[in-house]
């Protein structure tokens, strides 16, 4: 079995965790039960992966990415590199943009807006993320 965090699920779930993650890890490692139930922040999160065109098949590397610093949300780098002071693509799943808001619909709207700030000729993202959940 696989005993690690999933990617990109972790980047979306962990911002909502209110409980102390070290306490959780310690209890699990020591075989103890948690003293308190897990607590979660009362907001929703959405994450949209930015992937290299061609992923999961063949894709080019080295395309310059701009606008990451303009995103109002968290940007987790997955397949990026620094080249001559600029961020470039270096993998298939390049980054994930995660946004939070009071409702799932608002988080989805915000995330799609923020993803639009990222500029790179060699990136694509899915536009159906979260749609089924808000219908």
PLM regions with names:
Residues 2, 49, 66, 76-79, ...:
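Residues in well-ordered beta-strands of folded domains
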Residues 1, 5, 55, 76, ...:
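Aromatic side chains
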Residues 83-84, 89-135:
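Generic C-terminus detector
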Residues 61-96:
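Generic long, charged, amphipathic alpha-helical segments
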Residues 1, 9, 13, 17-21, ...:
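General structural feature for long, well-ordered alpha-helical segments within catalytic domains
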Residues 6, 31, 54, 62, ...:
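Glycine-centered flexibility sites
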Residues 19-32, 74, 81-87, 122-132:
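Short secondary-structure transition/capping segments
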Residues 2-70, 83:
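Active-site "cap" helix and flanking loop/linker of ATP-utilizing ligase/carboxylase catalytic domains
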């Amino acid at each position: 079995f696989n005993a690690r965090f999933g990617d990109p699920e972790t980047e979306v779930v962990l911002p909502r965790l209110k409980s102390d993650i070290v306490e959780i890890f310690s209890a699990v490692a020591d075989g103890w039960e948690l003293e308190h139930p897990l607590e979660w922040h009362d907001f929703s999160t959405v994450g949209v992966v930015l992937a290299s065109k061609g992923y999961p098949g063949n894709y080019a590397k080295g395309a310059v990415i701009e606008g990451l610093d303009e995103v109002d949300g968290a940007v987790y780098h997955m397949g990026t590199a620094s080249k001559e002071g600029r961020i470039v693509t270096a993998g298939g799943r390049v980054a994930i943009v995660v946004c939070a808001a009071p409702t799932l619909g608002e988080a989805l709207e915000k995330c799609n807006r923020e993803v639009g700030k990222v500029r790179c000729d060699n990136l694509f993202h899915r536009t159906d993320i979260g749609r089924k959940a808000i219908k």
